[in-house]
């Protein structure tokens, strides 16, 4: 070894293991407008200080590793490393902390949700020094957002395509979700659309199974759309699920849907993956298709309060990757969804600028810099008695989707659709007249029953159906 090499080694590199907090905990750091900011709920192992735990998350999700390496000297760690810049205890918890981490923009590939998540949540969640770790929120910088196309069309363009204004849209998931032949499936779609719904929907696991291959389903559903449009004079749609085992097969199904002239297709974005979803969103914009997104598998990731990724992060990621609709919970139905939290990420989906509001679980102010909005879809265990609450909670820019609440009507599918449409129109009319849907909802529905026997029958069937279970994911008090 030459003297020159010996001098460089002794000055620039010292082997060994250092505490993460020496390099990655920087409370004096002032965040930049271009930084991507993350709020992690950290539960350290006993004996691990929160500063070390937060710094470990910052290190393992950016430039750090478990030991000092000589190649650190070949780059500028100060330019590229993540920094834990603030830590606060979680109210009511003795061993949990919110650790805020800032990531330089250059760590991420432009226009790639896949790369963003691979960095931020790809490795740190298995770190032994942590008992649990949850990504609560992200602040996506405007500079990074501008590298994404986002939703294929957005809320206003969708309304213009459908020529439907001033009310929520109505949908129905066809049940049973598995087992119907393509012809019977198409028949159910036609009956629901003819009865007054705007959309019918493939369930998330309807792809191309032996009992109903995708091409047959697409053809019969397209027939249902055109027949119901001719009879009602309204534009109709069916969410044709293009999700497949390969991206090539997915795109083939999307192309066939476009050739049929249908207005909307569907993708399961978490099981299908962000790369596939972004590719499909680009195709949909280029070819005039709306894109409905199902969040199948989300509860595996977001249900636990102290570990995983909160759905508000998955919702932001979807807006970046691309989708015109996404399921968002109902607040009042059978699926998890606390009101303030749900409305927090509903605003993150729809609005252009959202202020920080910890009372709704929003950790950062988010500016979407004109990225199109996404329509939230309320679906899961809802029926006509829920209509006033759903209209009041979600407002006009939403899809209210009744599966069993349409197809379970005692008189059949079309009367079930009629009941839902009448209930919705009654609620919108009452709201526009200044009535309080939260206080007068049942009275409004009862009044509408007098001139709609279909609604009266639905109200009788579901008058005692409730889902009274405590939410798991609640705000910290």
UniProtKB/Swiss-Prot annotation:
Keyword Endoplasmic reticulum in annotation: no
PROSITE patterns, alphabetized: RUBISCO_LARGE
Required co-factors: Mg(2+)
Cofactor note (record): Binds 1 Mg(2+) ion per subunit.
Protein origin, superkingdom: Eukaryota
Proregion positions: 1-2
GO process terms (BP): carbon fixation; photorespiration
Keyword annotations from UniProtKB, A to Z: Acetylation, Calvin cycle, Carbon dioxide fixation, Disulfide bond, Lyase, Magnesium, Metal-binding, Methylation, Monooxygenase, Oxidoreductase, Photorespiration, Plastid
N-acetylproline modifications at: 3
EC number: 4.1.1.39
Additional detail: The basic functional RuBisCO is composed of a large chain homodimer in a 'head-to-tail' conformation. In form I RuBisCO this homodimer is arranged in a barrel-like tetramer with the small subunits forming a tetrameric 'cap' on each end of the 'barrel'.
HAMAP family from the UniProt entry: RuBisCO_L_type1
Name under which the protein is recorded: Ribulose bisphosphate carboxylase large chain
Lineage, opening ranks: Eukaryota, Viridiplantae, Streptophyta, Embryophyta, Tracheophyta
Gene that specifies this protein: rbcL
